[in-house]
Amino acid sequence: MDHGQLSMMADKFQWVFSEPLLNACGTEVKFCRRQRIITPFRLGLALTATCASQPVETLADFHRGFNALWGTTITYKAFYNQVAKSRFADFARTMTSRLIGEMTRKVLGFVKGRAFAEFRHIILQDGSSFAIHDGLREVFPGRFKAVKPAAVELHTTMDLLCDAPTTVVLTPDTTNEQAFLPEPASLRASVLLADRGYLDLHYLRRVQEEGGFFLIRAKAGMNPQVVEAFREDGKRLRSLRNKPLKAIHATLPKRQRVELVVEWQVEEHPLRLRLLISWNRQTKEFCYLLTNLPAKRYPLDMIYRAYKWRWQVEVV
């Protein structure tokens, strides 16, 4: 990042955390009416600074961080009364949303004319589950009640080209992951990378209709009609054509990866996609990738290498 870019980011940071803006935000969401020592500006900056500078395990860490930053002696009870307000969550959500939106900039790219250079965004989607205190099981029920009675899931949408999240949503662990996929229209001239938990053929059809692309891990047990079949070395597998996938599954090659052109009927319309299949020697099972990226521009090996980018969202 050069001096000009650093200067621009510094200006944005000062604007996002400016006193008038944060205080107005607190008033707008009805977090506070009268501003005393714990103003929205002071609280927002203290919370951000504390998270950025130390591990945070309890509310007391934020309380100490506030007093240290502003040189105050606010009691724990007074501090707790502010963050316990129902509107505090709205204030924190709005502040975080503005921070992500304003501080995100494009940091990665591709040479013009090369693969993936034509996409406006490369979107990564993921959901991560965390166990929390069992006392919260009624509000945040876990999927695996015997092991994790209470759990939450963090749904994250990330733009790889900006190397930053664009949407972060916290829900009970039982919430359906697919509800947090980007709107199909937002993926025009973009490509979505996601794990198999997000596979929804109706959604993929809408993405394709909107001019979007996807590369998503598929599930075992699918049964589309196989239209074409090629081995990794380019050999056409004529014996696998024009049959349901389940009918040929036992005869799929294991020494080489396979590319199939498959078709489903979705909402009374054909959905034709590329299904890439590889054999995992360690787990003794096939792995599947589903995409609508054109085969001539994006050959099999490139697709597998591109899917590795999805791990970037795991380390956010």
Residue ranges and their predicted role:
Residues 1-59, 65, 74, 78-81, ...:
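Single, function-defining residue in the core of a domain
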Residues 71:
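Long, low-complexity, charge-dense
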Residues 104-111:
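Primarily marks folded extracellular/lumenal domains of secretory and cell-surface proteins
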